[in-house]
């Protein structure tokens, strides 16, 4: 008799995706982040659901309701901090997952890669709207500054901003709709993640060498299930260390002050995972230019497959490209640091150089390095 997991219509889908899936025998720990992102998403949806049971999306009571969750709700404090720091873990996994894709040439799977870029955008939108919900000073001013960027769009900018706000300033209507979107988007992300997996399973996974691995495949279970469980345990360990020992390490003290439209904080800045994009935004003094640079800083990922000039897929055997990749990583860390600094000398010039370097590396230097390597290998 055939096993039920191979015959039952629902079980068959799960079986083909997580049990009998043929996987390359040599995929390293860098391939763990897909499953870790799935765990992060489930964790965020569950903690978010319990938070939503006690949260009120009204300007008068939002801040108080978050305080109430932390003080009065049973284990409310741990749910709140798991949700806030879970977002940080989510983005750490996201950045490492994208970095893995860039390094090993996983972007050659066009559909998978493009759905991944959409997922990145959706996750960033969700995180931004979530940051507004506690209605602290940084929530309010972050929402005001970031939504106001759209006013730089010619002709329709001002109307667009007021339409998003639901009025003439960030107010009750804005908070209510942000809560609604923040609640629905993770489910859209979950659906997109399934599409992401669907496209991936059409081609099969890439591997560190970038060479076709059809000749050497192993079943996903038990080899990669046990490997993913180890990754999950390490992720949960890191998250709980953060939640239980330094829950406010990555937050902003300003967000413990209730929102006040009459008092602007000295330094308005987003959460750490948006700082690199925020630095690129501030790089161009012109409003529209900054907004375009901000959008392009993420959209540029769509161009990466078109800019691939190497005859090899992975960077595993390409030392010059490896150098370029790690310079890009250092550049992004520099941008993250600059994004959190005030707009004054020497930070302005460092930010401008780092932003210029970011676009130069992806658009010019990395394709050039690949071409040089091709010539060195007489390809």
Curated annotation (Swiss-Prot):
Its main location: mitochondrion. The keyword Transmembrane applies. One of its GO terms (biological process) is mitochondrial electron transport, ubiquinol to cytochrome c. The keyword Transmembrane applies. Binds 2 heme b groups non-covalently. Heme b b562 binds at residues 83, 182. GO terms for molecular function: metal ion binding; ubiquinol-cytochrome-c reductase activity. Its cofactor is heme b. This is Cytochrome b. It comes from Alcelaphus lichtensteinii.
């Amino acid at each position: 008799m055939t096993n039920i997991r191979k015959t039952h219509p629902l079980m068959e889908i799960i079986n083909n995706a997580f049990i009998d899936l043929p996987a390359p025998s040599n995929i390293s720990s860098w391939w763990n982040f897909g499953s870790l992102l799935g765990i992060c998403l489930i964790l965020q949806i569950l903690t978010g659901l319990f938070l939503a049971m006690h949260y009120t999306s009204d300007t008068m009571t939002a801040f108080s309701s978050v305080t109430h969750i932390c003080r009065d709700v049973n284990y409310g404090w741990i749910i709140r901090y798991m949700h806030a720091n879970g977002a940080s873990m989510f983005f750490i996994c996201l950045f490492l997952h994208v970095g893995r894709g860039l390094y090993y040439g996983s972007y050659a799977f066009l559909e998978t890669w493009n759905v991944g870029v959409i997922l990145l955008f959706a996750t960033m939108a969700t995180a931004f709207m979530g940051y507004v919900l506690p209605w602290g000073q940084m929530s309010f001013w972050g929402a005001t500054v970031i939504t106001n960027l759209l006013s730089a769009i010619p002709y329709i900018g001002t109307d667009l901003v007021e339409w998003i706000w639901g009025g003439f300033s960030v107010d009750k209507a804005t908070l209510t709709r942000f809560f609604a979107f923040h609640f629905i988007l993770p489910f859209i992300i979950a659906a997109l993640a399934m599409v992401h997996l669907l496209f991936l399973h059409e081609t099969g996974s890439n591997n560190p060498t970038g060479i076709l691995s059809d000749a050497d495949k192993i079943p996903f279970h038990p080899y990669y299930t046990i490997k993913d469980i180890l990754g999950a345990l390490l992720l949960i360990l890191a998250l709980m260390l953060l939640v239980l020992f330094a829950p406010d390490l990555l937050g902003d003290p300003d967000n413990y002050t209730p929102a006040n439209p009459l008092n602007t904080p000295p330094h308005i800045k987003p959460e750490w995972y948006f700082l690199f994009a925020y630095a690129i935004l501030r790089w161009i003094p012109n409003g529209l230019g900054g907004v375009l640079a901000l959008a392009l800083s993420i959209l540029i990922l769509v161009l990466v497959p078109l800019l691939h000039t190497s005859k090899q897929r992975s960077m595993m055997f390409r030392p010059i490209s490896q150098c370029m990749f790690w310079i890009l990583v250092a550049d992004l860390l520099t941008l993250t640091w600059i994004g959190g600094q005030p707009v004054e000398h020497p930070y302005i010039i460092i930010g401008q150089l780092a932003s210029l370097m970011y676009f130069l590396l992806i658009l010019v230097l990395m394709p050039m390095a690949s071409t040089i390597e091709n010539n060195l290998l007489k390809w």
